[in-house]
Amino acid sequence: MLEFIDSQLSSWPLARANYQALGKTERRSFEIGDLRVGVQFNPARIVSTGARIDAVSLAARPCFLCSENRPPEQTPVDIVEGWQLLLNPYPIFPTHFTIASSVHRPQEGFPLDMVEMAEKLPGMTVFFNGRHAGASCPDHLHCQAVMTHELPLMCLIEERHKLLSSETSGMRVATAVDLGLDSPVGFVSVIVTPDMDGMRQLARIEETIGKKYIEEGLVNIFVWKDSVGILRIVGVPRKAHRPSSYGTGIGQYLVSPGSIDMAGVIITPRRDDFESLTIDDIRRIYSEVGI
């Protein structure tokens, strides 16, 4: 994958400039309960954070994930049947991919192909924004992938939700409460054992995470293989797409939480928001959009 990234950056000036800008990215940190939350100042992400996602706006613009509308420099890699891996030209982290469906179809359901993607991307977490949970392109099915160590919530869950030696088969499920965590983000953590029983139980994953939230597009889903090769799936159910404070007016913040924000890295494209966000503001944002 490093060769793919290098090749894209050498031939694509826009992406190269945005990845180089990451080296100057500013960040603040807050300890909120057991979760260390980062706030990143990233002006390039205004494309996503400020995206208009109403039906009229979507219909009025060409879909930027369809192959015919992509920049000519954006070269796809067929990662899993029916899916193409693309370098994200507006990155949050130094390794940041978009994985788009080869066919234009809505951002719906739980794409179980994410499990195979995670197998193909060791060290990375594949994540999915529900259409009402941070998706800036809800008319075209897609996932994204970043390095797992960049996501505080995933690191915390790996540390606290472990597969016991006595638990040898199937699926193990825990919430923040079950794990004794003081987390501003509610979640359902699933460990899938690498055997037939575990694979069979994957068929019930929607019920485990919350079928209602998946059907309503109010969920963020994360899939990865941990450091010992165990498959992990985390669902973060949502009750809102954006907090009441979303906007550009006085006392408002241009913060539109997607998976990365819910995983503990809040993206702020405006400097004023980056500098003025407080721990109470962050708690409020999480409480208004999460469960």
Language model features with spans:
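Active-site microenvironments that recognize anionic phosphate/pyrophosphate groups
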Residues: 1-113, 128-131, 148-291
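Helix-hairpin-helix/helix-loop-helix acidic hairpins
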Residues: 108-109, 118-121
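Active-site beta-strand/loop microenvironment that shapes enzyme catalytic pockets
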Residues: 120-154
